[in-house]
Amino acid sequence: MTPAQCQARLDAGHVTFVFAPPVSEGKCAIPLPVRLRSLAIGADEIQFTGEPTLDCRLAERLADWIGNVVEPLARHHLGSGLAAIETGPGYVCRNRNNEVAGKLSEHAKGNALDIAAFALRDGRRVAVRPADQLAPAEATFLAAARATACGYFLTVLGPGSDAAHAEHLHVDLGLHGRTTNYRICE
């Protein structure tokens, strides 16, 4: 993808962003990184509080999922639209689960994002936590958002997947297996 193609796709998705310098740190690299700032939905804007640095393709997919699925789910289940998505930085040069050895994390390619919470327009904040730690409507909203993420991303991990993902929702576009045709949705 060229910078012009990235610009056109994110502009079409009503994404406010800036191009970041290409990343190259040893095995870690993002040839076309962007920093996400916000997503416009009609007259409203949803802020990305961490301004994560991501590969353009992930930024496009994320904006599509949030705008077309997560925002309507929040209105339906919680009675309020989204004001912000609280995220991690996106890009981090590290191995999976911060292990000393092992496979490179999708974060190291700008191909993954961790979502810690959803801030609502009415001032509430829905943190990603196990369902038994949430109000029923919040648990239903997070379960629906997580289930729909499995149709947009190739890996979706969150509370109950493992200890490393107990307090955030991890989404990425990492390819899996020899044929690269399956998803991990836990």
Which residues make up each language-model segment?
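Short, solvent-exposed polar/charged micro-motifs at secondary-structure junctions
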Residues: 28-32, 93-98, 168-170
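Active-site acidic/histidine clusters and adjacent loop/turn architecture
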Residues: 2-86
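Glycine-rich, flexible loop/turn motifs
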Residues: 24, 32, 100, 153, ...
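Conserved aromatic-histidine-acidic binding/catalytic patches
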Residues: 54, 58, 103, 137
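Beta-hairpin (beta-strand-turn-beta-strand) motif
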Residues: 41, 88-90, 118
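Catalytic cores and adjacent binding grooves of peptidoglycan-active enzymes
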Residues: 37, 71, 104-186
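Active-site-adjacent substructure of cysteine-protease-like catalytic cores
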Residues: 76-110
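Short intrinsically disordered, low-complexity coil segments enriched in acidic
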Residues: 1-4, 180-182
